[in-house]
Amino acid sequence: MTDRWDRYFLDLALRSAAMSKDPRTQVGAVLVGPDREVRGTGFNGFPRGIADTAERLNDRDLKLRLMVHAERNVILNCARVGIPTKGCTLYFAATDHTGNVWGGAPCCACAIEIVQAGIATVVSPPFKIAPSHWREDIEFAGTVLAEADVGYRELT
């Protein structure tokens, strides 16, 4: 894809992120097929049917136990309705409570699910501004993607 298309799909990922009710970090993902068709979207949030209460969202430990990451959500959303993910490109982007936009490889758990879903490429904003507490996990996830021959690129 061209930078123009990549930017368009990253913008859609950021729009999806805006749907998240997480008060600290909003992450969005868009899955795109080989013909530039959007196959699905996702954002970080609680599972269907689980109430997004202020108590749960503001209790970090509880929130992290309930939260479905955006990358996983888009894969599950596609699986739920039978949309193929094999050979697709996953775009994801995050914003934090200060308005910074960041990216990098997904977390390791999401990277493994991306590999298992047959996704061919991951595109995100630059790694350099990802929160420090995610750095080690993001670096290892990049290794997982590379070893599994999943393309990864950052769009600056």
Show the residue positions of the predicted features.
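Short, basic/aromatic recognition patches
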Residues: 1-25
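Short beta-strand scaffold segments in enzyme catalytic cores
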Residues: 26-40
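Zn2+-dependent cytidine deaminase-like catalytic core
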Residues: 3-4, 40-155
